[in-house]
């Protein structure tokens, strides 16, 4: 029972000590790093087996001692320990224990001293000295335990949960307390000394176990402190690791961002390069299209220029050919004019000087132009020049004044010839149409009379003033004019009609002038006889109607020729003798009066004679 009570008290004491250590650990928050277990010098490993065997022996001896020993023996033994015969043994033993305790504190726990029996040298001399020594040792032991409890601070309450089980010990013996052994009387002194020795041995074991427990607790506390320090270090390392991990994550993230940025920059650079290349290709395609369009346009223009050049070359060739043809034609005309002049000169020698007296100036001018042309052409042939190198222009320049003079003279001569030709027609002397025999004779001699030109106006005036000659018997002798005179007058009218195209007169104006001119002879012949007037009027009407009809036909043909001039030169290259082709009157173009007259006149009429005279003139120019 007492052992149980003591065990409970020891547990309560241990719990109070644990609470004190908790409070002290909570108040002391500073970190301390105790020495590692490897730094404890002369550390002795104690097996739990030996401890258990020692505890078992102690308990067996303790219970046996309680049964066999008496209280008197214990009291006598304690008295001997207090008294001591000499008093030196207790001091020496106390010094030995103190030195042993110091050695335990300095060198660690030595269980071999407690597990083997002590030598006989260390046994106490007397019981009093032993008692005093035990009391001092207990006091020092408790003080050392208290100091160790205050010095060693456990980290956690689990520090007391050691695997080593320490046996409970009784309450420490103090010097004030006396060992009271009651019950049995003391026995033999030798036995008491042996009991004291055994008790001292037990106490030494208990103290050694307590010191071992304290050292184990300190070791456990050191280990737990080391564990705590390790935990702190681990936490710090974990914190460092976490910081390093965060830094590594940030570095990885930064690297990823930089990689993404570099990739984006590369993509942008590639896209910009592709865009620039695409733009360059677009510009190149536009330029190529434009160049192709320009090439097509230039090719088209070149083809047009080539075609125009070929046309110009063809035109030049045609112009050169036409110039050559015109030159040849002009040469032929000049030769014809010269031969015509020679023939006219031969005709002048046949008593026709009076008929050609008024027409010598114009013929001389034409002859002069023809001779000048032939001379220039001959000079060009001698020099070996071409007609396209400007020599022809020089000929035209040289003959320009003479040609203009000739044309002006012709323009001035046409109205005068026209008036003289109209006045030269003896309309009043015509009394009746000629007979058939006379017509045949006149038609036979018309070839020679067709070349007669108009006579001076004075001769025609004399004839008109004296149309009727009186015979000796007083009768009027009417001299009918021959058809040759009518032929000459009609040829003069035709020449005037042909030359009137240069002045661009209309047919209506010409008809009005003819009517006015027809009125003048009528007014001048009002004093004639009525019968003569009727005959003359009928003849004049027939002649005027024929002239007007012929003029109308000529004007229509000239309009057709002028319209044909608008066509290309290749289509209007007419024959050089076209002007001398006879123009016959179509029946549908004649009026009713002309048709009636035509039916009443035979083939040997004036129209037939005019046609024959035109043919003879053509033969003359060709021959």
From Swiss-Prot:
Keyword annotations: Coiled coil
Span list, region Disordered: 417-485, 497-536
Compositionally biased spans, kind Polar residues: 422-431
GO cellular component, one term: chloroplast
InterPro entries in UniProt: BLT-like
Keyword tRNA processing: no
Biased composition (Basic and acidic residues): 452-481
Domain of life of the source: Eukaryota
Covalent S-S links between cysteines: none
Coiled coil: 256-351
Protein name: Uncharacterized protein At5g41620
Organism the protein comes from: Arabidopsis thaliana
Upper classification of the organism: Eukaryota, Viridiplantae, Streptophyta, Embryophyta, Tracheophyta
């Amino acid at each position: 029972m007492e052992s149980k009570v003591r065990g409970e008290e020891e547990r309560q004491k241990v719990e109070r000590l644990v609470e004190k250590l908790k409070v002290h650990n909570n108040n002391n928050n500073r970190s301390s790093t105790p020495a590692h277990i490897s730094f404890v010098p002369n550390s002795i490993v104690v097996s739990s087996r030996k401890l258990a065997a020692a505890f078992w022996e102690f308990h067996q001896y303790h219970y046996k001692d309680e049964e066999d020993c008496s209280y008197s023996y214990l009291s006598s033994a304690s008295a001997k320990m207090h008294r001591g015969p000499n008093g030196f043994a207790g001091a020496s033993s106390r010094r030995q224990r103190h030195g042993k305790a110091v050695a335990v504190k300095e060198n660690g726990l030595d269980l071999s001293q407690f597990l083997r029996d002590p030598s006989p040298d260390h046994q106490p001399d007397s019981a009093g000295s032993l008692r005093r020594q035990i009391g001092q040792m207990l006091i020092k032991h408790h003080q050392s335990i208290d100091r160790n409890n205050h010095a060693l601070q456990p980290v956690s309450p689990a520090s007391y949960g050691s695997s080593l089980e320490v046996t409970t010990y009784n309450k420490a013996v103090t010097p004030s307390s006396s060992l009271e052994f009651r019950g049995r009387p003391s026995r033999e002194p030798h036995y008491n000394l042996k009991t004291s020795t055994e008790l001292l041995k037990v106490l030494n074991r208990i103290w050694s176990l307590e010191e071992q427990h304290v050292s184990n607790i300190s070791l456990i506390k050191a280990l737990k402190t080391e564990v705590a320090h390790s935990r702190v270090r681990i936490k710090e390392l974990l914190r460092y690791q976490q910081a390093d991990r965060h830094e590594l994550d940030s570095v990885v993230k930064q690297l990823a961002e930089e990689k993404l940025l570099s990739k984006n920059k590369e993509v942008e650079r590639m896209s910009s390069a592709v865009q620039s290349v695409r733009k360059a290709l677009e510009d190149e395609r536009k330029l190529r299209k434009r160049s192709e369009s320009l090439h097509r346009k230039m090719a088209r223009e070149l083809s047009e220029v080539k075609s125009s050049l070929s046309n110009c070359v063809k035109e030049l060739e045609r112009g050169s050919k036409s110039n050559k043809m015109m030159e040849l034609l002009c040469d032929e005309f000049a030769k014809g004019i010269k031969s015509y002049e020679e023939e006219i000169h031969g005709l002048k020698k046949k008593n026709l000087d009076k008929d050609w007296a008024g027409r010598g100036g114009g013929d001389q001018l034409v002859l002069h132009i023809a001779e000048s042309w032939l001379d220039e052409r001959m000079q060009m042939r001698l020099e070996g020049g071409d007609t396209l190198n400007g020599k022809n222009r020089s000929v035209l320049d040289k003959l320009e004044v003479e040609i203009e003079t000739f044309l002006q003279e012709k323009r001035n001569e046409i109205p005068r010839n026209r008036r003289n030709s109209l006045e030269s027609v003896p309309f009043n002397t015509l009394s009746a149409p000629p007979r058939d025999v006379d017509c045949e004779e006149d038609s036979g001699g018309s070839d020679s009379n067709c070349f007669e030109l108009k006579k001076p106006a004075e001769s025609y005036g004399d004839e008109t003033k004296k149309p009727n000659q009186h015979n000796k018997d007083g009768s009027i002798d009417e001299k009918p004019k021959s058809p040759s005179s009518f032929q000459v007058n009609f040829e003069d009218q035709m020449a005037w009609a042909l030359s009137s195209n240069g002045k661009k007169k209309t047919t209506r104006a010409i008809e009005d002038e003819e009517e006015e001119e027809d009125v003048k002879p009528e007014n001048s012949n009002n004093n004639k006889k009525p019968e003569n007037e009727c005959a003359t009027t009928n003849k004049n009407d027939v002649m005027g109607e024929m002239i007007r009809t012929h003029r109308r036909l000529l004007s229509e043909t000239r309009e057709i020729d002028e319209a044909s001039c608008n066509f290309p030169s290749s289509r209007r290259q007419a024959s050089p003798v076209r002007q001398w082709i006879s123009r016959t009157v179509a029946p549908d173009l004649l009026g009713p009066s002309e048709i009636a007259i035509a039916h009443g006149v035979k083939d040997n009429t004036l129209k037939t004679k005019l046609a024959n005279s035109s043919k003879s003139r053509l033969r003359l120019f060709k021959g």
